[in-house]
């Protein structure tokens, strides 16, 4: 029986390839900060060959790893914040009208990261500021289809068209293969995202094809798939 390991992380898909150094169509670059507390890996899927080899759509997948992310220390969070900001700016370019979408169900803990981010976001679209601000930010928590009866992509598309959004930044929970990556890994990608993918409930994708504007997805793994734990248990039992 072919039991594949489920993961949303491009870096884990690459790790699962036997000959990871020879993957046509896939480019990989890794950077570690000065004190080696933050590792950033950029995986670029260049073409259809790369899509087939990695199992991910063409585009960039940036993975920021920091094992100390769970610690409540400003000295740890500040360099991580700077790294995340820098990578986001690289992907976003000079877009001025941004919609941040907090995907997920705030009533389900592992699926609530999107709404929690929105709760702590400083939005600016409603502010009456002199001149034209460099960045206009608005935000929405569209809920999940079981709550609204509406596909998330339809809600977001309507908002984008109404307020002329240039770029969508979607925040969501992801699924990881390794429990060691839970809560201490951030993946950014310019390929969009399927709402609910982290909890196994894929809906229509938030993508440039479906929304008519660029989509940046930011995800944090909050769950692993049961088979991952089962395989680990079987391995220990056979020792």
Question: Which residues does each PLM region occupy?
Answer:
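N-terminal amphipathic/basic leader segments beginning at the initiator methionine
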Residues: 1-58
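An N-terminal, well-structured beta->alpha segment
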Residues: 49-93
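Short glycine-rich or small-residue beta-strand-to-loop segments that form or flank ligand, phosphate
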Residues: 65-67, 97-108, 139-143
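Gly/Ser/Thr-rich loops at beta-strand to alpha-helix junctions
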Residues: 103-113, 146, 173-177
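Glycine-rich phosphate/diphosphate-binding loop of Rossmann-like nucleotide-binding domains
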Residues: 105-133, 139
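A structural-propensity feature for long, helix-poor, extended segments
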Residues: 136-159
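Glycine-rich phosphate-binding loop
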Residues: 153-204
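Conserved small/polar residues in nucleotide/adenosyl-binding loops
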Residues: 228-235
């Amino acid at each position: 029986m072919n039991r594949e390991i489920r993961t949303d992380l491009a870096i884990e898909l690459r790790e699962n390839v036997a000959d990871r150094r020879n993957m046509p169509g896939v480019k990989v670059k890794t950077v570690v900060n000065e004190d080696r507390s933050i590792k950033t890996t950029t995986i670029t899927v260049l073409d259809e060959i790369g899509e087939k080899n990695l199992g991910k759509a063409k585009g960039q997948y940036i993975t920021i790893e920091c094992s100390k992310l769970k610690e409540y220390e400003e000295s740890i969070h500040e360099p991580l914040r700077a790294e995340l900001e820098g990578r986001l700016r690289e992907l976003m370019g000079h877009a001025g009208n941004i919609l941040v979408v907090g995907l997920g169900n705030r009533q389900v803990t592992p699926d609530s990261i999107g709404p929690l981010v929105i709760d702590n976001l400083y939005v600016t679209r409603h502010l009456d500021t002199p001149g034209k601000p460099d960045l206009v930010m608005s935000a929405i928590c569209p809920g999940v289809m079981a709550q609204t009866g509406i596909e998330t992509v339809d809600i977001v598309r309507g908002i984008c068209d109404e307020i002329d959004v240039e770029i969508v930044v979607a925040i969501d929970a992801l699924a990881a293969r390794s429990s060691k990556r839970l809560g201490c890994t951030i993946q950014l990608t310019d390929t969009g995202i399927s709402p609910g993918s982290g909890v196994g409930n894929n809906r229509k994708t938030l993508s440039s094809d479906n929304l008519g504007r660029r989509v940046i997805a930011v995800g944090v793994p909050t769950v692993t798939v049961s088979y991952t734990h089962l395989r680990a248990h079987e391995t220990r039992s056979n020792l």
